[in-house]
Amino acid sequence: MIKVAEWGTGMMGQGLLGYILDRPKDIELVGVIVTNPAKEGKTVGELLGRACDVKMTTDFAAVLAKKPDVVCINTQSNLHEITDQVVPAIEAGCNVICIAEKLSYPWASDAAWADRIDGLARQHGVSVLGTGINPGFMLDALIAMWSSICLRVDKIVATRVNDLSPFGPTVMIGQGVGTTVEQFEKGVADGSIVGHIGFPESIHLIAKALGWTIDRIEETREPIVTKVERSTQHVHVAPGDVAGCRHIGRGYVGDELKIELIHPQQIHPEMEGVETGDYIEIHGDPNVNMANKPEIPGGKGTYASTGNYIPFMKDAPAGMLTVVDMPLPRFWTPTA
């Protein structure tokens, strides 16, 4: 039985809680930490609508004092937003799995932070792992696995075509959905429209797996302008305005383009005949062409990935780890 605590109960956190409750003979849920005081004292059962009397609390020290084997953090995207969660968990002697995109390869955005966490984890004999579907699998770990059947790899081109319709207002703002083209371009320039978070991380994960050294990363963000009216629960887009963002990340070895990751995301792509999907091309010997349609749902893929790594953490080496350091990921069948 693995003792697990969860930190964060948003959409991803709730999905992971469901995964945990589906494994009552494998996982003991020892505590759930929330950041919203309104959830204090309520049970997981009340949150999910299923049987579970574990109470949620803002008192993270009390939960960490129960010595969970693994703490699963599902809160923010950026390193400095999760520091006050990752550090206490490490210092309590807990392994950490976290869905923050920047944690999938933290050296890409803050090498000093990554080295600090690596040293702290080694000092306490625990492992820290960043997971998710993207970054964490579809545009990096899966590519690395496909490369294992190649004699030579010259270049990688991968595309993930997404439907943003299920997501909330924070995602819409970050992708520029509902803006005019002029507002979109201004948002890209001032950093308020970011598109996808994780291209540098995915590029470095692929490079690490293949033994390449990336010398330069370039990113471009272009508006996806709709010809038809589109709307979701959170946003309305008129014809001529922006329905999404076409974000591309390119990684160079010297002056040679070695990795190109393409990620067009928009609301209701089907309204203009666009099919969602995941595509991987490896140019080499032999060539690899993988296509999966429709897309793997980002939410389910993220919390499933997190849960399926839980049993690997006990025997993982201490330190700051990445998915390409870990054993081949797989589905964790619940004990009957």
Residue ranges and their predicted role:
Residues 137-149:
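Alpha-helical support elements that line or immediately flank enzyme active sites
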Residues 101-126:
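Rossmann-fold NAD(P)-binding glycine/threonine-rich loop
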Residues 7, 147-272, 276-278, 296, ...:
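Active-site-lining helix/loop region of Rossmann-like oxidoreductase modules
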Residues 35-37, 76, 94, 101-104, ...:
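Short, ordered loop/turn segments at secondary-structure junctions
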Residues 62-66, 70, 79-101:
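Rossmann-fold NAD(P) dinucleotide-binding segment
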